[in-house]
Regions:
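Walker A/P-loop
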Residues: 21-47
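Switch/connector loops and helix/strand junctions flanking conserved nucleotide-binding motifs
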Residues: 66-69, 111-115, 143-145, 193-198
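N-terminal pre-P-loop "Q-motif" helix
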Residues: 1-26
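Conserved Walker A/P-loop ATP-binding site and its immediately adjacent core
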Residues: 41-77, 109
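SF2 helicase catalytic motif II
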Residues: 107-109, 124-186, 190-191
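Short basic/glycine-enriched coil/helix segment immediately N-terminal to the Walker B
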Residues: 24-25, 96-99, 116-132, 176
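Inter-Walker segment of RecA-like/P-loop motor cores
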Residues: 77-118
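Interdomain helical connector at the RecA1-RecA2 junction of SF1/SF2 helicase-like NTPases
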Residues: 175-176, 182-183, 194-207
Length: 207
């Protein structure tokens, strides 16, 4: 790892290991101000290894970033035993449950409902797992309209329509994610809104 990646991993590891939860079911959270070329996917996976996480869920508004997450996991020798689950790739039922895995998906897909207003059948398994960590990639990216435009510009019409149906607002927070986890890792190259709002305290931020 580069020095800045190692610094981010070390600070996050120490916070997660030493911070006590106020309640048993509380989730700890940490924010990385991951500027361009920081190498957030590689550093995130190194943190997962150091924390000994086995089940990691990566959620993003922009499915187009999947390739970066998938390639870093599959092509680097450090993660040779890890498996990668995605919408159009390997599925949960196909993996070796004894080995660690990463599931990549979009907010709009995992928060979307079927016609009956219930969790989509294909995503039910993800709601039955207590994840070691949920990584929120570019979570604080822009306003609702900026997010919608960015998704539309990728040409992925299904994701765009799903985003509009879910109706994710600018005040969207982790409490409405119907999936449980012990840790949240927020990744953002533009975390200004989160920093200004006081959502994170200094010990929860790598800047």
């Amino acid at each position: 790892m580069r020095p800045e990646q190692e610094a981010a991993v070390n600070k996050t590891f120490n916070y997660f290991k030493n911070k006590k939860r106020l309640k048993k079911d509380d989730s700890l959270k940490f924010l990385w101000n991951a500027k361009m070329r920081f190498g957030k996917t590689f550093a995130s996976y190194q943190l997962a290894k150091r924390m000994n996480w086995k089940r990691v869920l990566v959620l993003t508004f922009l499915p187009a970033v999947q390739s970066a997450w998938e390639e870093d996991l599959k092509l680097h020798i450090d993660f040779k035993d890890w498996q990668f689950i995605s919408k159009d790739g390997m599925q949960y039922k196909e993996i070796n449950k004894k080995k660690p895995f990463v599931c990549f998906g979009s907010f709009q897909d995992f928060l979307g409902k079927n016609k009956s207003g219930k969790i989509k059948n294909k995503n039910e398994w993800a709601h039955e797992i207590n994840w070691d960590c949920i990584i929120l990639d570019e979570y604080h990216y822009g306003s609702w309209t900026e997010r919608a435009k960015e998704i539309y510009d990728t040409g992925e019409k299904d994701e765009y329509n799903e985003f509009l149906k879910v109706g994710i607002s600018d005040n969207f927070d982790q409490s409405i994610i119907p999936i449980t986890t012990d840790h949240y890792l927020y990744l953002s190259g533009t975390p200004f809104r989160a920093l200004e709002s006081g959502e994170f305290i200094e010990e929860q931020i790598y800047n």
